[in-house]
Amino acid sequence: MSTNRKNDMMVYCSFCGKSQEEVQKIIAGNNAFICNECVELAQEIIREELVEEVLADLSEVPKPIELLHILNHYVIGQDRAKRALAVAVYNHYKRINFHDTREESEDVDLQKSNILMIGPTGSGKTFLAQTLAKSLNVPFAIADATALTEAGYVGEDVENILLKLLQAADFNIERAERGIIYVDEIDKIAKKSENVSITRDVSGEGVQQALLKIIEGTVASVPPQGGRKHPQQEMIQVDTKNILFIVGGAFDGIEEIVKQRLGEKVIGFGQNNKAIDENSSYMQEIIAEDIQKFGIIPELIGRLPVFAALEQLTVDDLVRILKEPRNALVKQYQTLLSYDDVELEFDDEALQEIANKAIERKTGARGLRSIIEETMLDVMFEVPSQENVKLVRITKEAVDGTDKPILETA
């Protein structure tokens, strides 16, 4: 209970000793009193301790080689992209530690290096970002760029991305301000033309401009309940200068832009320049000029200086993804059936067929689970009730639908 009087006697703060006349308010507790100034001081001490805890968590950032080793446990292939991400993430958190410990007299100001990941659907963009955040034990949030609109239009404000990060950090602002945000489908909000448009582009350039502000670093007002901002709503202030933004997209068709650029160079400057090899990967040749031509505004490209290009996964890559990573799908389903005292085996030809199906559907790695679910639906429905079944074997025929999985009994 709040009071300025206690039985008409002078009341003093039990912590600082000030009287009720020297402070704005004194709160009465069980045989003790505390003034508003001591409450504010206690809050400040707690905030500082929370910041110190967050900084301590990030003071020992894994080296790039260590980060690559972690990624290799979970992500198959994409070696160049994993190296680029490991270096960028290490430098990002090293930069934060530098700014937190540097002397005021030091002139060097390390700029933030956000990341642009380009790769086809199912190549592992989201999973790479998730794995990095998990390995660093920092809050992580995913946003879909196509759901965003610029302020004043029906849709989701870009500040709601920060709300997702706050939620992932249990509303610990200091932790959230050192988290990672992955913005997917950035290519879907590309401008339709390189020419400047005089019409409003609700989900294109306008959203890019709105994203630009939080990506480059600003103090954003975040509505704690989400949705649109209201004048009466109390906002949470989030500083984005130390949040790492990883922006990704498939950029379908960008290879043609790269081919055109490389072809023009060959014609214009002779044989000493790089010729187009139809069998080579143009994804590794992407430069800022190509991304701008695709429809991303140059200001946003400038805030995404690190490019990580992911390759289309091959059948062999997908087979390895099925069985090799620490959390491989085959291991997951084997664990599920083991709870029913049933062993699960996949023939090599079955794994090949699953990978081929994913390639045909153009779903990449993200489509593997649904194919296994289709194949094993009847098994997972019936086997828990069949106590005599001890082994389930998935064959190529079971995957292509021409036969059922083989069940072996005790």
From Swiss-Prot:
Q: Does the keyword Cell membrane apply?
A: no
KW Metal-binding (keyword) present: yes
Task: Please tell me where ATP binds in this chain.
Answer: P120, T121, G122, S123, G124, K125, T126, F127
Record keywords: ATP-binding, Chaperone, Metal-binding, Nucleotide-binding, Zinc
Q: Which GO terms describe its cellular component?
A: HslUV protease complex
> Organism's domain of life?
Bacteria
A biological process (GO) of this protein is:
cell division
Q: What job does the chain carry out?
A: ATP-dependent specificity component of the Clp protease. It directs the protease to specific substrates. Can perform chaperone functions in the absence of ClpP.
Q: Which family does it belong to?
A: Belongs to the ClpX chaperone family.
Name of the protein described by the UniProt record? ATP-dependent Clp protease ATP-binding subunit ClpX
Q: Which species does the entry assign this protein to?
A: Streptococcus pneumoniae (strain CGSP14)
